Amino acid sequence: VKQKTTNNAKIADHPILMATLYNYFAAEYQALCYQAYNVAKERTILLHKTFPKKKNMAIVLDIDETVLNNSPYQAKMIQINAHYDSCWNTWCRQADAKPVPGAVSFLKYADSLGFNIFYVSNRKEKAVK
């Protein structure tokens, strides 16, 4: 006899459930984000002081989960029992992702010091603009 899988069982088995819950509810998530960007800020200050006349310094970051938090997208994937590719482009076009804690202030500060900022992404070109 094959038992019918309930939606709750599918949700519990979804591969990104724990990571998504962590991003939503763990105090450590926000603290670690701020810590990472504070360390990055310290490094940019050090580089700027060490090489004050250098004009070509750059910061390169990935967009998703480094600058933008896609937890709402991940939660939706869990809720509808879907996986990454099925509606990623739709999510990107909606432009609903919020910044990762600390990202905006760090990037504004780095920009004010004259750092060139480059973003890496697997998003389609239309979704990045």
For the regions a language model picked out, list residue spans one by one.
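Detector for Asparagine
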Residues: 7-8, 23, 38, 56, ...
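Second-shell loop/turn segments in exported
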Residues: 22-33, 89-96, 118-124
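Active-site neighborhood of HAD-like aspartate-dependent phosphohydrolases
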Residues: 50, 56, 67-98, 105, ...
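Non-catalytic pre-domain segments flanking phosphatase-related domains
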Residues: 1-61
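Stable alpha-helical elements in mature extracytoplasmic
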Residues: 33-43, 99, 103-106, 127
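Acidic helix-start/capping segments at beta-turn-to-alpha-helix junctions
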Residues: 56-67, 127
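Substrate-recognition element of Asp-dependent hydrolases with the DxDx(T/V) motif
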Residues: 65, 103-129
